[in-house]
Amino acid sequence: MPTMGGLHQGHGELIRRASEQGPVLVSVFVNPLQFGPAEDFDRYPRTLEADRGLAECCGAHALWAPSVDAIYPSGLPSAVSRSAPAGLQTHLCGASRPGHFDGVVTVVARLLQLVEPSCLWLGEKDWQQLVILRRLVVDLDLGVVVKGVPTVRESDGLALSSRNQYLFPADRARAAALPAALRHADPSDPESSVRQSLAKAGLEVEYVERVDPRTLQPCGPETAISLLAAAVRCGTTRLIDHVFLMTRQPLVAIDGPAGAGKSTVTRAFAERMGLVYLDTGAMYRSVTWLVQQNGVDHQDAVSIAPLLNDLDLQLKSLPGGGQQVLVNGQDVSDAIRSPEVTASVSAVAAHRCVRQALTAQQKAMGAKGGLVAEGRDIGTAVFPDADLKVFLTATVGERARRRALDLEQRGFPVPERSELEAQIAERDHLDSTREEAPLVQADDALELVTDGMSIEAVIDALVGQFRSRVGEEAWPTPAG
């Protein structure tokens, strides 16, 4: 957990959260490379003994306060060895503090090289820094998991900061106007309304910007989840803060071919993030089962259409993450996973009447967000405006192995591996070439190939992508 010292209860919460996962090393290093010529490097709080006490009290296993020579053995003039991505620092603090984030990525890369941690814990208060360091870890392929922790605030909403101790009493009273202005921003014109509120409170505005939380590029009201961030000067103290603006709750779309493990990981991901799980595959399987039960030819759309008129299809979550599927009051949870249903579901799902009926139902269920759906065309046809789109896939051989294991566990006969591979390849062909809503990766979807990945690793990857778009403060992880 990298810090510059001057620890407070915001750092304490980081330490407490991190200590639940394993031993915690807190570093204290006032990095000269991230201060501009006229900034507060010389007066930045240096309270090492108090920092040690707070870190120990909150559960840290060790505190490390390296010297400048230890971090930059070649000396400061040649120390800046990395640059933050230009696109991530053209707005917000990056625009007004040139070189700041280059200094941040340089020191954090050095710390990670020296410590080799499994996890990097950071506060969400400086969201731009969090985004940039997430990119650093990916670009360097360090295999480090980046965890963000929500901003800790005073009772009046002011975000805890080491620099808050600079505030004189009168300034401290005015500083509370920053979180209040962000919290009460006018949805029709949030930037202007915040600027007006801050100016009225006597705060000097450095910037107020609305950006995409992941790209940090300006965005407008058409973006369902955006970041409204501001920096001000209150007296001689610089303060930053942000809020998430959400026109609806988060919406996640997970697509991919048959046997890629979508249902398993999506269900677990939904439970971990507190999202409703929508298994669209189960919906199409349910209609296929109904077609077979009524003796209707699965190729005959005209005969299938009347079955949809009075269809009562319900998906119910069960304790422990399971799901019950009811068709016209009958529990078909196991029946829809049979080889017979599997063999015909692609053909049934290709009928326009079926897709239109189920897509309309799915859109209605996701209108308010707070949902993760998996299927074949979620990110392209059902929820093209999803905040996160993932195309989950695996090789045919890997999917055949998983299918064999699933059939065995459900008590069905298991065909030869070559036969399963042929079935899966044929299913891929049918799904990707059908006229109505074919299986295709959305242009803005992240492809995740899961060969060799454990279920937990796939879920962690999904959580990481979700958190790069939606902060903990905006959508808290459920307790437990």
Swiss-Prot record:
NCBIfam families for the chain: cmk, panC, PRK13477.1
UniProt entry tagged with the keyword Lipid metabolism: no
CDD domains: CMPK
Gene3D superfamilies: HUPs, P-loop containing nucleotide triphosphate hydrolases, Pantoate-beta-alanine ligase, C-terminal domain
EC number in record: 6.3.2.1, 2.7.4.25
Stretches for region Pantoate--beta-alanine ligase: 1-243
Any Gene Ontology biological process: pyrimidine nucleotide metabolic process
Originating organism: Synechococcus sp. (strain CC9605)
Name of the protein: Bifunctional pantoate ligase/cytidylate kinase
Transmembrane spans: none
Record field: catalytic activity: (R)-pantoate + beta-alanine + ATP = (R)-pantothenate + AMP + diphosphate + H(+); CMP + ATP = CDP + ADP; dCMP + ATP = dCDP + ADP
Residues reported in the UniProt entry to bind (R)-pantoate: 34, 129
GO cellular component: cytosol
Matches recorded under InterPro entries: Cytidylate_kin, Cytidylate_kinase_dom, P-loop_NTPase, Pantoate_ligase, Pantoate_ligase/cytidylate_kin, Pantoate_ligase_C, Rossmann-like_a/b/a_fold
GO molecular function, a single term: pantoate-beta-alanine ligase activity
SUPFAM superfamilies, per the entry: Nucleotidylyl transferase (SSF52374), P-loop containing nucleoside triphosphate hydrolases (SSF52540)
Sequence positions that bind ATP: 4-11, 123-126, 152, 160-163
Ranges for region Cytidylate kinase: 244-480
Keyword Cytoplasm (UniProt): yes
Residues annotated for beta-alanine binding in this entry: 34
Biological pathway: Cofactor biosynthesis; (R)-pantothenate biosynthesis; (R)-pantothenate from (R)-pantoate and beta-alanine: step 1/1
Family note: In the N-terminal section; belongs to the pantothenate synthetase family. In the C-terminal section; belongs to the cytidylate kinase family. Type 1 subfamily.
Pfam families to which the protein is assigned, alphabetical: Cytidylate_kin, Pantoate_ligase
Subcellular location(s) per record: Cytoplasm
Keyword vocabulary terms for this entry: ATP-binding, Cytoplasm, Kinase, Ligase, Multifunctional enzyme, Nucleotide-binding, Pantothenate biosynthesis, Transferase
Function: Catalyzes the condensation of pantoate with beta-alanine in an ATP-dependent reaction via a pantoyl-adenylate intermediate.
